[in-house]
C-alpha cells in the first residue's frame, strides 16, 4: 500500500439533526471515508454528510480537524468537505487515462479513526448506471472488490492515482464496489471549493420517489416523506405508464424525461393503479432546497 495513498485517506463522522429530511432514511449519525484532494479539502460520497450539522475529519495521525463547510453535488453524488486549516497530505487526482475493463485497481477505506484497510482487484465494467433514488451516471466504474470498510474512500489505479470515489457496495445484485469517476469532481471543483450551489438554470426537476424497473414496467417502490410525489398522491405500487403523454421504458429514459424539466414545473404522471389509469400531477421540487 503506497504511503502517500494511505496518508490521504481520512475518517469522517457526521451528526444529522433528527428533523432533517434524510435522517429517517440514512440515520442521524453516519461514518465514512474520504480522500484529501488538497491540504484543506476532502472528497467523499455526498450521502455521508447530507444534512450534517456537525462533521469531524480524522487523519491517519488520529487528530481531529475542524470543518468549515461542506458542499454537496446531488447530480454526481459527491461532496467536498473544507477544513478550517490545511495540513492533510493530498492524493494524486488524474482522470486520464480512463480506466477500462480488466485494469488493475485498489481501494482504500477506514474502519475507524486510525484503521485503514485496502482491497485490490480489477475493473469489470465502465458505463451507464441507474439507481432507484433519482440518480444516474453516464459513466460509473464497477470493480471486482468488496469494500472492506466504510463508503466514500478513493479508488486508485496501479500507479496510485485517484480514479474515483467508492460510493456503493453492490454485491447483493451481482456487482461489487461502484465508484464515481474523479472527472466528475474535477468538472465541479471550483464551485465546490467555493461552497456554491448549481445555478437555478442548472438544477433538475426532482419528484421524490423510488422507481424500480420490473418486468411489468416501472413500479413505484416508495416515496420520500414530505416530498413532491407524496404531496401529489403518488402511491407505492403504482406503475408509471407515461409522463405528460410520453411513454417511458426503463429508468434511464424516465430520468431523462424528468430532467428535461426544472424545479417548479408541473409533470403529469400517468400511472396504472389497480386496473385503472390515473393521472397524478406532480409539482417538481428542488432537491437542493428540500435537503438543505
Give, region by region, the residue ranges found by the protein language model.
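C-terminal cap/linker of serine protease catalytic domains
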Residues: 1-2, 158, 162-215, 256, ...
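Active-site region of chymotrypsin-like
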Residues: 8, 20, 84-90, 117-175, ...
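Terminal peptide-recognition signature
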Residues: 10-12, 34, 40, 44, ...
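Flexible, gly/ser-rich surface segments that form the specificity/activation loops bordering the active-site cleft
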Residues: 27, 91-136, 171-177, 189-202
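A short glycine-leucine-enriched loop at secondary-structure breakpoints
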Residues: 94-98, 154, 159, 222, ...
